[in-house]
């Protein structure tokens, strides 16, 4: 997912950008900060909706919803397991597991059911060899590497630029962030399709 950086780093970044000896990176700063703001807004909206629909109870848990949807789609080689964290739900095609967060796995709310069904939607995509899922899976290692490096590279780049050094390190950091941002847009068809499959089943 797109990484949200520390507010202090954002503040320092803006101040440095204003005093930097070059103006050639202005557009990159705008794109970077705009993308980070957008990702924060999307994340906040998602958490708000999840919290709202978590208050509406149903007779089954997220785990039961996931298991029943797998059964109805004749998928027998995928396991439903619990994973630590909040909204850390995902489908892992490598070991064929639907990983439901603690707030979904044992919860009997509409929100939990929707999230569980969405993740099983990815399992159905995998079982049916949905091509966009294959592309996303192939890009995951690259995106994970970019996500791990982007913070430190951006910080080093900012420091070097403030000291009058070459901006290429900062450019590299912005490029790494662009990779994670592009990944989010590339995988939109996968997410929309998984949601459509979940809604159809529900």
How should each PLM-predicted stretch be described?
Residues 21-31, 165-176:
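Hydrophobic alpha-helical transmembrane segments
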Residues 14-20, 158-166:
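Helix-interface capping motifs at the ends of transmembrane segments in multi-pass membrane proteins
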Residues 35-42:
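N-terminal glycine-rich anion-binding loops that anchor highly charged ligand groups
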Residues 2-22, 26, 42-146, 182-202:
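Polar-ligand-bearing catalytic/cofactor-coordination segments
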Residues 31-35, 180:
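Alpha-helical transmembrane segments of integral membrane proteins
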Residues 145-155:
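Core segments of transmembrane alpha-helices
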Residues 162-163, 170-187, 202:
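Long, well-structured alpha-helical subdomains associated
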Residues 125-132, 153-163:
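Membrane-helix exit/interface motif
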């Amino acid at each position: 997912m797109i990484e949200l950086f520390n507010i202090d780093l954002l503040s320092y970044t803006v101040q440095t950008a204003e005093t930097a000896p070059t103006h050639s990176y202005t557009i990159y700063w705008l794109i970077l900060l705009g993308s980070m703001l957008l990702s924060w807004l999307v994340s906040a909206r998602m958490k708000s909706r999840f919290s709202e629909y978590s208050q509406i109870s149903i007779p089954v848990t997220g785990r039961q919803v996931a298991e029943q949807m797998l059964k109805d789609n004749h998928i027998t080689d995928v396991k439903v397991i619990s994973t630590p964290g909040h909204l850390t739900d995902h489908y892992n095609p490598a070991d064929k597991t639907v990983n439901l967060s603690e707030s979904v796995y044992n919860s009997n709310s509409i929100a939990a059911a929707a999230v569980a069904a969405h993740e099983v939607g990815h399992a159905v995509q995998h079982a049916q060899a949905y091509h966009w899922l294959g592309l996303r899976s192939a890009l995951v290692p690259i995106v994970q590497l970019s996500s791990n490096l982007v913070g430190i590279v951006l910080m080093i780049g900012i420091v070097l630029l403030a000291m009058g050094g070459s901006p290429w390190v900062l450019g590299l950091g912005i490029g790494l962030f662009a990779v994670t941002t592009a990944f989010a847009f590339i995988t939109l068809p996968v997410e929309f399709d998984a949601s459509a499959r979940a809604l159809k089943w529900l």
